[in-house]
Amino acid sequence: MNEFERVRAYLTDLQDRICAAIEAADGQARFQEDLWQRAEGGGGRTRVLRDGAVFEQAGIGFSDVAGSRLPPSASANRPELAGASWRATGVSLVFHPLNPYVPTTHANVRFFQAQRDGEVVASWFGGGFDLTPFYPFDEDVQHWHRVARDLCAPFGDERYAAHKRWCDEYFFLRHRNETRGVGGLFFDDLHGDFERDFDYLRAVGDGFLDAYLPIVQQRKDTAYGEREREFQLYRRGRYVEFNLVYDRGTLFGLQSGGRSESILMSLPPRVRWEYGFNPEAGSAEARLADYLVPRDWL
């Protein structure tokens, strides 16, 4: 297999493994699969689990798509590639748990190639994972970052610090002056050594469940009431704001004529906004603000 096909094979297997693990953790609902084709080239398989015992909605999509001209969002940092044809493959997921004490999470791993006259002129990896709690626990956040740090260790002493910082900077809502959550890892435009970079992509993809599932198991049976549920729905609004205003993956998908249903799968099934909402001073809800700033968790 060529490089692209090797990455593609890994990603389809990763989607299968994550789906199996999430179904087992939920214990009730199953993923429904939607196979789709893209007119300009390629397609994918979108899988969504709804109304489970643990997950209100969990979406995970695989795609392998191509186009004749890079959209502006993809060539903004690489102007020399403007107008090149392209092919991209990736797995992207967002899980929205029902229990407000279980954090929302997002992960993405992807590979991109730009071509001119049928020849690959550039290729790179991107991805990461991040965590968005509503009622955070220090031990959960520390576990999350410990897994991230440990999977980065074989790739150099600076890898975790650099990609954690990139995550903090990327998942930041400037109009709210807060991070989307407690961070994790984020990277883009990783190139130069295909085998080493592919190893890192696999470490991130394979490490996601190690980081997330123990938190799910720890919090999924925590008792909650209407107050916690209402706060969860309110904070989900921040997720919507980020994805529709800032997220490059969303913008790329929409600009490249992607499949809207799959692109917007990341949005929560239920959400609310409230004008002028301020949590009660000293409350668990007010405490969340202390976590929405970049911090060294380890």
Curated annotation (Swiss-Prot):
The record marks H175 as: Important for dimerization. The active site is at H106. Substrate binds at S92, N108, V109, R110, G257, G258, R259. Pathway: Porphyrin-containing compound metabolism; protoporphyrin-IX biosynthesis; protoporphyrinogen-IX from coproporphyrinogen-III (O2 route): step 1/1. InterPro entries: Coprogen_oxidase_aer, Coprogen_oxidase_aer_sf, Coprogen_oxidase_CS. GO terms for cellular component: cytoplasm. GO terms for biological process: protoporphyrinogen IX biosynthetic process. It holds the Pfam family Coprogen_oxidas. Its cofactor is a divalent metal cation. It catalyses: coproporphyrinogen III + O2 + 2 H(+) = protoporphyrinogen IX + 2 CO2 + 2 H2O. Its main location: cytoplasm. Its EC number is 1.3.3.3. One of its GO terms (molecular function) is coproporphyrinogen oxidase activity. It is found in: Cytoplasm. It is an enzyme of class 1 (oxidoreductase). Belongs to the aerobic coproporphyrinogen-III oxidase family. This is Oxygen-dependent coproporphyrinogen-III oxidase. It comes from Stenotrophomonas maltophilia (strain R551-3).
